[in-house]
Amino acid sequence: MSMPAAETQPKKKRMTFKMPDAYVLLFMIAFICAIASYIVPAGEFDRVTKGDVTTAVPGSYHSIEQSPVRLISFFTSLQDGMVGSAPIIFLILFTGGTIAILEKTGAINGLIYNVISKFRTKQLLFICIVGALFSILGTTGIVVNSVIGFIPIGLIVARSLKWDAVAGAAVIYIGCYAGFNSTILSPSPLGLSQSIAELPLFSGIGLRVVIYICFLLSSIIYIYLYTRKLKKSKDASVLGTDWFPAAGMGEAGKEEDQSVPFTVRHKLILAVAGLSLVGFLYGALKLGWSDSQMAATFIFISVLAGLIGGLAANDIAKTFITGCQSLVYGALIVGMARSISVILENGKLLDTVVNALASLLDGFSPIAGAIGMYIASALLHFLISSGSGEAVVFIPILAPLADLMGITRQVAVEAVMLGEGVVNCVNPTSGVLMAVLAASGIPYVKWLRFMVPLALIWFLIGLVFIVIGVMINWGPF
């Protein structure tokens, strides 16, 4: 006699939390700020203007009549944020267009593949040269998100050098982000942050170069020590026994497919780009050039590089526009984030927030205040993984707060740059990190085992330089 089949209970779908898109998150924050304008008392500081810089007068905060942000004003604030951020938005778009043309000519790929092929058999030299190359591309903003495309090359080299996938990905990805996280010349987020804080573009470069070198050296040493462990014992890998989890990745048979020529034409294109950026840097530091001149520099590089690269006029135009399109998401998020400041300003809440933070930090030394900014920026970056988005949300609050606490705005900007930088390579909301791990087959938890110690080293380096910045009154203001 057969027994009746046991009834199977339908499986309940498990509710899983999904991190909202950055635009959704910023819209929610903007909406909350608009609601707050009906509840939170409005107020403002008296301000004084010295030259081109406007600062809040400490102790001058006073209540004013409530200025609620109504429904129509809320939506027009989104437009106002875009319009107010237009110079930076176009600068970011033009950056994408220029990089697309440099890539189209083959100059960037030719340089990278040429360096990798030359030094791939020399372990320490390979880590130093390739790590330094990608860090330069990262700190100038030339290769940031596109680093994902070079991960397979790192895996190929890792297999030939008897490393694991983590080491192969790290040389490329961490090399790039060691530079980006301690950026010297990136239009976004550094140029954007300094513009919001009313600082001269790329000012304070001397100390930033030292910070960049420390980030790079610590990364190179850390990766090299890890590869030495792999040479001594196969059990040293954070991946266990499966050194290349992504099927087919890093196979030696693909090496020949990666041969890319590096011609005189490529070298000339890179020379033009490099000299143009050096020329702009001189103009920014000595002649007061700003984002308008930088955008013009990118257009100049695009046209000249395209012509030297043998591209037709139509190809230059189409490639430039395609490159701009690739950065629309990151560019418009600047305007979206700026709308939050517009709402806080229209609702007369920005100074209320600054005053509340100043009261909370009352009695704290400038050093303690700067460290607080540094840690707060790191924590905020887990929510707003866009560096430019975080800068536009945070800098309008921190700049006047820095004035009130006796901290230079340069230190406040660097606290945000380093705060977001030290968590970039462990941040689960980072699309670039997740793409790198997917391309290399590295589980996120195992990546954390490798990356967290280096992130802590970066954090301590950042902490030391934030303190130094306060002590030397790092400016110009």
Curated annotation (Swiss-Prot):
InterPro entries the UniProt entry points to: C4_dicarb_anaerob_car-like, DASS-Related_Transporters
This protein's name: Uncharacterized protein YcgA
Top-level taxon in the UniProt lineage: Bacteria
GO cellular component: plasma membrane
Source species of the chain: Bacillus subtilis (strain 168)
Keyword annotations of the record: Cell membrane, Membrane, Transmembrane, Transmembrane helix
One Pfam family per UniProt: DcuC
Bilayer-spanning residue ranges: 22-42, 82-102, 124-144, 205-225, 268-288, 294-314, 316-336, 364-384, 387-407, 425-445, 452-472
Family: To E.coli YfcC and H.influenzae HI_0594.
Subcellular location: Cell membrane
Membrane topology: Multi-pass membrane protein
Record flagged with keyword Cell membrane: yes
